[in-house]
């Protein structure tokens, strides 16, 4: 089985940051990416389990994968076009 998290185009370490900082950093990072590129987000704020999927839906990006069973949380998103 392929690890979806193993080769992202970009990585964002949001460990130790609390809402709303992780989503603000994701938004800033995604703004500088090309459509189709992927971003791995590593976070430990429980609010990200709600905020990251909501951000993807609202901004029309794809939440490719998420791992939220334990810390740190990992999210892989693909920038929409």
UniProtKB/Swiss-Prot annotation:
Changing residue 58 to A: No binding of IscS, 67% modified tRNA produced. The active site is at residue 19. Its main location: cytoplasm. GO terms for biological process: tRNA wobble position uridine thiolation. Changing residue 24 to R: No binding of IscS, 50% modified tRNA produced. GO terms for molecular function: sulfur carrier activity. SUPFAM superfamilies: SirA-like. It is found in: Cytoplasm. One of its GO terms (cellular component) is cytoplasm. This is Sulfur carrier protein TusA. It comes from Escherichia coli O157:H7. The gene is tusA.
């Amino acid at each position: 089985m392929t690890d979806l998290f193993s080769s992202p185009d970009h990585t964002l370490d949001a460990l130790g940051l609390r809402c709303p900082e992780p989503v603000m950093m994701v938004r800033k990072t995604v703004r500088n990416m090309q459509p189709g590129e992927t971003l791995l987000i590593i976070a430990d704020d429980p609010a990200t389990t709600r905020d990251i999927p909501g951000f993807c839906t609202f901004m029309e990006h794809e939440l490719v994968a998420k791992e939220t069973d334990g810390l740190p949380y990992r999210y892989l998103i693909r920038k929409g076009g």
